[in-house]
Regions:
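Conserved polar/disulfide-associated segments of primarily extracytoplasmic proteins
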Residues: 53-144
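N-terminal targeting sequences that direct proteins away from the cytosol to non-cytosolic compartments
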Residues: 5-60, 67, 130-132, 139-162
Length: 162
């Protein structure tokens, strides 16, 4: 009787010890990370800018007299990828200035490159709110860029999240 009682107690102890195996099936739906909606941006466009010349879900290009303005929205996370996408250069090849603004971070940088119409000068700004990168780039011919320095500064300084 003692043996039977001992076997019964041991059986009760060891029956709950097996680890439950988790099995994933084809019908399981993957967990998708949902990003917040992109925020609204504000930029003071100059009077000589025409209506958007090209527009897509992620960006807009405006043509002005001697320069172009492009605005893009990209997923946040990889600043290196965003800077490379905007400028064609990695952040290590540029001087990227970081400024903390109330609820986002601002990155400013400048570069020049040879274009079809000669040497091009470009200034850009990327705003990072943690969910998206909002990029503004102003580019024009190096010969006439000096004439528009004040206008370009005004455009870039006005670029912010609302």
């Amino acid at each position: 009787m003692k043996k039977l009682l001992l076997l019964l107690v041991c059986g009760m102890i060891f029956t709950g010890c097996g680890a439950e195996q988790t099995v994933e099936t084809v019908a399981d739906e993957p967990v998708v990370q949902v990003l917040a909606e992109p925020r609204e941006i504000y930029v003071a466009l100059p009077d000589d800018s025409v209506l958007p010349a090209m527009e897509s879900d992620s960006g807009t290009v405006y043509f002005c007299k001697d320069y172009d303005i492009s605005i893009q929205t990209m997923e946040s996370g990889d600043l290196r990828k965003t800077v490379k996408s905007v400028s064609g250069y990695s952040p290590e090849e540029l001087t990227v200035m970081e400024t903390a603004v109330s609820d986002y971070v601002r990155y400013d940088f400048v570069w020049s490159a040879a274009g079809e119409l000669g040497q091009q000068v470009c200034r850009a700004c990327v705003l990072d709110d943690g969910n998206y990168h909002y990029a503004l780039a102003v580019m024009g011919n190096a010969d006439t860029a000096g004439e528009y320095g004040e206008i370009w500064s005004g455009i870039l300084e006005s670029f912010c999240l609302v």
